[in-house]
């Protein structure tokens, strides 16, 4: 897969730091567990050894995945993001048209790698993200989600 991944500087640094931790600290710890399990003798019935090997495989897979993503990453400068329409790294204020209390919701659209719904960061590939991309202030959007349909009006587009 050679698709570009658009990240904030913080997102890129977080991934780079995680990769560094896996390669320097975690890899060493896992190799020590494997060596310790080997010392217990017969490997054919050694659950500790099998668990350590499984942990090693998962860790190596994560390392390859992070290296791949960092190779494909482009760091976006928030100062260069336009706010005439909803794009990756823009934040939007939405009015929930399905509620009678004029509920206002705020999201920031990010790559899948940086999505964190607890912080209001949603993926541009999510149903909400896909529905918002390219829209302008004042537009109404209908979003198909597993629970049904949501209806919002875009009130504001800005960069944090």
Curated annotation (Swiss-Prot):
The organism's place on the tree of life at top rank: Bacteria
Keywords: Coiled coil, DNA-binding, Transcription, Transcription regulation
Family as reported in the entry's similarity comment: Belongs to the GreA/GreB family.
Gene3D superfamilies membership: Transcription elongation factor, GreA/GreB, C-terminal domain (3.10.50.30), Transcription elongation factor, GreA/GreB, N-terminal domain (1.10.287.180)
Protein name, entry field: Transcription elongation factor GreA
Molecular function, one GO term: RNA polymerase binding
A biological-process GO annotation: DNA-templated transcription elongation
Residue ranges of the TM segments: none
Coiled coil region boundaries: 43-75
PANTHER family: TRANSCRIPTION ELONGATION FACTOR GREA (PTHR30437:SF4)
Function in brief: Necessary for efficient RNA polymerase transcription elongation past template-encoded arresting sites. The arresting sites in DNA have the property of trapping a certain fraction of elongating RNA polymerases that pass through, resulting in locked ternary complexes. Cleavage of the nascent transcript by cleavage factors such as GreA or GreB allows the resumption of elongation from the new 3'terminus. GreA releases sequences of 2 to 3 nucleotides.
Gene: greA
């Amino acid at each position: 897969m050679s698709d570009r991944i658009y990240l904030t500087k913080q997102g890129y640094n977080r991934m780079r730091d995680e990769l560094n931790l896996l390669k320097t600290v975690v890899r060493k710890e896992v190799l020590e567990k494997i060596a310790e399990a080997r010392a217990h003798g017969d490997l054919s019935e050694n659950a500790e050894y099998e668990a350590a090997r499984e942990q090693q495989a998962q860790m190596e897979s994560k390392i390859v995945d992070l290296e791949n993503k960092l190779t494909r990453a482009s760091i976006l400068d928030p100062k260069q993001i336009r706010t005439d329409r909803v794009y990756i790294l823009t934040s939007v204020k939405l009015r929930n048209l399905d509620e009678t209390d004029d509920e206002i919701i705020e999201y920031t659209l990010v790559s899948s790698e940086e999505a964190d719904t607890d912080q209001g960061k949603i993926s541009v590939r999510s149903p909400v993200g896909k529905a918002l991309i390219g829209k302008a202030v004042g537009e109404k959007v209908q979003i198909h989600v597993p629970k049904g349909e949501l209806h919002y009006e875009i009130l504001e587009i800005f960069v944090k």
